[in-house]
Amino acid sequence: MTHAPTPPAASNFLRPIIEDDLQANRFQGKLWAGKPGPAALQAQGQPDPARIRTRFPPEPNGYLHIGHAKSICVNFGLARDYGGVCHLRFDDTNPEKEEQEYVDAIIEAVHWLGFDWQADGNDNLYFASDYFEFMYEFAEALVQAGHAYVDEQSAEEIRASRGTLTEPGTDSPWRDRPADESLLRLREMRDGKHPDGSLVLRARIDMASPNINLRDPVMYRVRHATHHRTGNAWCIYPMYSWAHPVEDALEGITHSICTLEFEDQRPFYDWILARLAELGKLARPLPHQYEFARLNLTYVVTSKRKLLQLVREGYVDGWDDPRMPTLFGLRRRGYTPSSIRLFCDRTAVSKSDSRIDYSLLEQAVRDDLDPVAPRSVAVLDPLKLVITNYPEGRSETCSAPRNPHDPQAGVREFPFTRELWIEQDDFREEPPKKYFRLFPGNTVRLKYGYVVRCTGFTKDESGKVVEVQAEYLPDTKSGTPGADSVKVKGNITWVSAAHAVPAQVHLYDRLFADAHPDGGDKDFLACLNPNSKQTVQAWLEPGIEAVPGATWQFERLGYFTVDSKDSRPEAPVLNRIVTLRDSWQAA
């Protein structure tokens, strides 16, 4: 197989920023008390051993997908490369949608991807819910300082009063209520004395700001809901735009790296941090938010709503279906953690939205597996080949490299017998031009075995060819003197019919046939690829140990792995990871 040239390292606009920060000693004097906390706690700490701190902050309301992998690699990778620490933080501020199941799955997925958050004796696994008391304390401080107020308008009234991109908003009638009155209402909200949606806490900023996100954004809302960690201890929950900067500051994050949709929220992020630092609640230096373009792939949807619809309506077989873009789906498909990291490293970290061709992900797993995957042979669409002049009952050993790139891997041995399985596509009764495989009268090499000449074939009642006959040339066995005395143009793979291992093989392909299934007004379900999964009964080279997760390159076919859920020692099930070459047109 011809190797594609290794792509150059992708650009990352964040690296020069971090290098400038470190060169300017912007974090010199930053203290760390060994755990997150407000300014008073951090003042008791020691100089932070981490040169930078980043974080990966998923909400535990679903399974991680390939887009999350990019953010994971960016945040953990930058921390690793610059002597820092990356925190894993769960932004669990929305109790109706979050579950412990997702927490456990996210932890497993990040670990599987090859990253750890333990450093300097700290676990660095955190939850936004750990900071609810701090957030509430800070909210009271903002109210008392005149920076926030409790609004009793309905959600519809608040929405209508925000204005538009071209028109300013209008002040709430509650905007100028006395701080003591707002504080009383906030405490009533905290104590559960008001129903859902009746009151909110809003920041007092500027209702005429050209940035709508600064028009007195909501900070707290009433939600009488059970939280997966705190139970019923709270009935008010922070909005993400309020919680996010507070969490970052409490954890001593230096570089808060988000996707582009949070760019318009950055002024509020900075406003919150500045006000709380002025009030002595947060330690300086304060975090800074940076935004990069999210990873968008062709032939993929990553919307949680759409992925959930695929699962619930039975278009796929669960969240770990090998066609899904979830990390568990990719893992079951046979993608390795290193292949996903390689793919992420090859895609730029930039501020420009773009769509990456799915073939780059497939090429990453090819490049990752090619040097290490043992070779073997499988016949997916079997046709019987009988060597008529080979003695019945006889068997001899053929050999081949386990991996041509790794001489230390040694050789594999497999039997040659009178009856073999070959691919249906390797025989033609009437061959087209430039067809060099088996057809009546033609000579080919059985790879690693003998040269054979086709002498005939047999059809069933429907006219389908069910058996091919051939004669072998005894002095042409691969690896023996004179093996190349007969020149042939075709090589075909085979397995011994008497020794081959039967297996079920799932031939997976892209889930969508349309490169942009979620573009415009498309019905994404109408873009599904009807051939994204085909199941065949195959014959495998003997000697294969069908251990879940084991991976091979089946010669001429692609890379395959043993399914982690359905495979059994007595009944192997394999998944095709990727073909040897890309068969799709570039999007």
UniProtKB/Swiss-Prot annotation:
A single MF term (Gene Ontology): ATP binding
Motif ('KMSKS' region): 301-305
Database matches in Pfam families: tRNA-synt_1c, tRNA-synt_1c_C, tRNA-synt_1c_C2
Residues that coordinate or bind L-glutamine: D91, Y240
Cellular component terms (Gene Ontology): cytosol
Record-linked InterPro entries: aa-tRNA-synth_I_CS (IPR001412), Gln-tRNA-synth (IPR004514), Gln/Glu-tRNA_Ligase (IPR050132), Gln_tRNA_ligase_bac (IPR022861), Glu/Gln-tRNA-synth (IPR000924), Glu/Gln-tRNA-synth_Ib_cat-dom (IPR020058), Glu/Gln-tRNA-synth_Ib_codon-bd (IPR020059), Rbsml_bL25/Gln-tRNA_synth_N (IPR020056)
Record localization: Cytoplasm
Alphabetical UniProt keywords: Aminoacyl-tRNA synthetase, ATP-binding, Cytoplasm, Ligase, Nucleotide-binding, Protein biosynthesis
Quaternary structure annotation from Swiss-Prot or TrEMBL: Monomer.
Protein name as catalogued: Glutamine--tRNA ligase
Organism: Bordetella pertussis (strain Tohama I / ATCC BAA-589 / NCTC 13251)
Taxonomic lineage of the native organism: Bacteria, Pseudomonadati, Pseudomonadota, Betaproteobacteria, Burkholderiales
